[in-house]
Amino acid sequence: MLTTLPQKAEPAHTALILVDVLNAFCAEGGAMHREGRDLSLVEPMMPRLHKLIQAARAAKIKLVWIQCAYNTGPNHYLSEVWLEQAKRRRNGAYTDFPVCEPGKWDQDFYEVRPLPDEVIVT
């Protein structure tokens, strides 16, 4: 059992989890931008994220990439309950256009890219 901080922080027992660094959520023209969300914090964050990824790879820390895959088209993966909540809380923004459709630009990673041996969770 890992009991000390140095043991727990050892690269063999550590992972950097990158969640939703996707065009949909970070890029001009992505779903959040089209919805009118403020993306002003994304650009200042990206150089830091690049450095963090580079340092994690250099330290042999496992990188795990989370990549959403869903849409709101006729074959959507979102539950009816979720869509109803989106309509009530966000004026239906998610029901007006697809978000993170598999294989589309919106679902692609934004200014970062997993290496072939890194884990992608979709």
Cite the ranges covered by each PLM segment.
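Active-site acidic carboxylates
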Residues: 1-115
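Glycine-rich oxoanion-binding loops at beta->alpha junctions
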Residues: 114-115, 119-122
